[in-house]
């Protein structure tokens, strides 16, 4: 290892040509004046080596690398530098070979043995020592004005075992992050960091970082058989070091690349990877012990969707941990869903164009800080879902795109590689190593960060070969269809692996088409001939679009759109659904939830309250994006986040916004306490229409039923008039009804048109009828 500069290390793309002071470029011998400054005991010339040996060993012959090895090492294209460098038994003793560009002299140290090596030029040093066995040894390396005693990285055996290599070759290493990437470790009694990267098309790979002044010339990696993996153990390198891989492409050009398996990164726009070692101690054992008590579709789930960087702009993970759990718990949500946390270079992508799939974004802190946030949420009784983006990745030339000089993570067919909507690249789901990268990534977040579930983004774009493509821009699959069979197999493998490894986890699909069996088990074949995709839940995009369209119309016109509020029950039990009012619906000119509603400010709030009441009563889990819980009027912006000032008592209209927030809190309280609202979300026996055809009245009414038949009656009046004495047919075995929530209550900012308590039905022909108002 060369002397470290005082700075943390510049961007390697800008500093490849910079050399530490007093050092000479590769290929040039140190000047004579420089030699005189080297320590006298290790002074060496190109033709002789002055040696001091307590044991009496002498360098008899210089076993320098042959011309071919030398050329490949200098060019960065050697596949097995350990076979040349380090110490090796040869006829006559042990040959020592060292490649230390810019060094003036190198001495081998082993116990009392001190042997100065020949300077063979171009940074190569060698010597033959008459020893019987290869000793454990260190190197004393002299530079101009200084010298360092270091370990020889080329004396170590590979750090990856046969099982790791077998699983890597099969594409079945379910803990891939433990094999690849950068890992501080102790190897053969020496502390350092193991670097490993998959780059099968590379002619050679070196590791560069602050520890070698971003010049990887002296640190070539070895290729491990047919796996395509390159590996090197660097003694003395520890947590916190910046690094990249310097890859020689098939055409001989070089590129610096961030580690695809980096578990920590620099803060964007900087792009280096960071060696990371976690020492976090979790405190969420009780949460994990009960997480699998009930499957997600049979448990209450009310989700608060959060964009962490803008929820309270400027807060770190640890600062968020002091505020977010308390806020979410106070409002009664069962889960948060975090928009993508994995590292991404462009904040304006909201995290949906990922470059660091294994690293939480460094904008808010380090990986242990993110663990602390998850831990605090769990200890507050809140589950953590995370948006996960396996469909595509950006084209940044320091990340995954043509990683080793050829299409690697992306499909080799340009028609399959380019995503037509986002200008990104789609993963090659048919390549086993790529599939392994993604499946292991899903497992990684759930095992290492205790994430309770993944909401998989853009599933529809993965499933169809013709997604957003015109005729001629795609080719059918082997059966002549438009289904992406590779993506189907990947999603099935991901879900099956995750559910097997992580008890209590849930996966959620953002899938906007009528694909059959999104939440069906992978081993159950459907009418289309495919097994299910194996997700636990699916976003109900149809319900969202239809219901929001209905609400956007003036009440006088809603009778013409009544079916948009009832059609969801036609297919409600075809999948396990989430009802999403997500970030996508409150940006880019779509307006916030309350601003979608017609009428004046009072009517807009009344409409939003009525809509939220309908949403919480409808079969399916709920998801609400931040800011909508208090009727923010403006669209969301990642630059400034929710308008919290609307809740400030000093603001004149704050009571209006606090009223909607209080409604959301009470909706969650009633929801969690009422099994009829969630236990039979996926069973037709849990729902019964009472009034489904009153289009002229803008009225809907239905029963939700618990497993024992205990009912809850939900009544929605989407007209701007009070319907006093409105008659509804209800089961006659219920003697009285208690109104648990009315969205028009004064405390929510409504007109306080509520029902008496209790409401007693009036018998009529074997069926009770109750009078309702509101």
Swiss-Prot record:
Its Gene Ontology biological processes? glycogen biosynthetic process
Give, as in the UniProt entry, the pathway in which the protein acts.
Answer: Glycan biosynthesis; glycogen biosynthesis
Enzyme Commission number, as recorded: 2.4.1.18
Give the keywords, sorted: Carbohydrate metabolism, Glycogen biosynthesis, Glycogen metabolism, Glycosyltransferase, Transferase
Q: Output the SUPFAM superfamilies linked to this UniProt entry.
A: (Trans)glycosidases, E set domains, Glycosyl hydrolase domain
Q: Which reaction does it catalyse?
A: Transfers a segment of a (1->4)-alpha-D-glucan chain to a primary hydroxy group in a similar glucan chain
At the top level, the lineage of the source is Bacteria
Instruction: Give me the stretches of Low complexity compositional bias.
Output: 41-55
Q: Which InterPro entries match?
A: A-amylase/branching_C, Branching_enzy, GlgB, GlgB_N, GlgB_N_E_set_prok, Glyco_hydro_13_cat_dom, Glyco_hydro_13_N, Glyco_hydro_b
Q: Which residues catalyse the reaction?
A: 457 (nucleophile), 510 (proton donor)
Composition bias, kind Basic residues: at what positions? 29-40
Q: Where is this region: Disordered?
A: 1-66, 748-774
Per its UniProt entry, what is the enzyme's top EC class, as one word? transferase
GO terms assigned for molecular function: 1,4-alpha-glucan branching enzyme activity; cation binding; hydrolase activity, hydrolyzing O-glycosyl compounds
Q: Which GO terms describe its cellular component?
A: cytoplasm; cytosol
Subunit info here reads: Monomer.
Family matches, as HAMAP family: GlgB
Task performed by this protein: Catalyzes the formation of the alpha-1,6-glucosidic linkages in glycogen by scission of a 1,4-alpha-linked oligosaccharide from growing alpha-1,4-glucan chains and the subsequent attachment of the oligosaccharide to the alpha-1,6 position.
Per the record, the similarity remark reads:
Belongs to the glycosyl hydrolase 13 family. GlgB subfamily.
Q: Can you name this protein? A: 1,4-alpha-glucan branching enzyme GlgB 1
- The record lists the organism as Streptomyces coelicolor (strain ATCC BAA-471 / A3(2) / M145)
The gene name reads glgB1
